[in-house]
């Protein structure tokens, strides 16, 4: 199964994403590391899955074990505030920030690597 087909079946459709696109190489394979085009609302949904231990609207999307692995220091998310705030960045400054102790997910679609940094330091 192609990567994008797998994600549509097990992630995008189950959480209600309908407008997602992914860049592909000349052979038609998705470029997994970059090129995901997603609405900000859907990026927040993705973050909320992690905030809620792998569930979205009480439906299991990811295993708790996977969520724990992703939050492990140095694995996938950057950590701030002594490990209680998590941030994952994308190309051109896109960010999703998860703050479990405040029950919050914040998403940012920027255009430039320093957009988010400039916003948070002003």
Protein language model features and the residues they cover:
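Structural helix-adjacent loops and short alpha-helical linkers that scaffold large soluble proteins
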Residues: 1-8, 54-62
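Active-site helix/loop module of the DD-peptidase/beta-lactamase fold
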Residues: 2-34
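Non-transmembrane alpha-helical segments in soluble domains
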Residues: 7-8, 12, 44-51, 67-71, ...
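Active-site Gly/Thr loop motif
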Residues: 17-19, 63-116
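Carbohydrate-binding/catalytic loop surfaces
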Residues: 25-38, 81-83, 89-91
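Active-site-proximal alpha-helical segments within enzyme catalytic domains
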Residues: 34-55, 94-111
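C-terminal, helix-dominated tail/subdomain
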Residues: 40-43, 57-71
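Short, gly/Ser/Thr-rich active-site loops of penicillin-recognizing serine hydrolases
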Residues: 117-122
């Amino acid at each position: 199964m192609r990567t994008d087909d797998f994600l549509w079946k097990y992630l995008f459709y189950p959480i209600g994403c309908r407008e997602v696109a992914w860049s592909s190489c000349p052979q038609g394979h998705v470029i997994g590391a970059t090129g995901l085009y997603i609405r900000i609302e859907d990026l927040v949904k993705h973050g909320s899955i992690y905030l809620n231990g792998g569930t979205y609207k009480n439906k299991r999307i990811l295993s708790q074990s996977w969520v724990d692995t992703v939050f492990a220091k140095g694995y996938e998310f950057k950590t701030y505030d002594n490990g209680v705030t998590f941030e994952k960045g994308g190309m051109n400054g896109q960010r999703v920030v998860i703050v479990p102790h405040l029950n919050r997910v914040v998403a940012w679609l920027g255009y430039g690597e320093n957009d988010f940094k400039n916003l948070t330091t002003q």
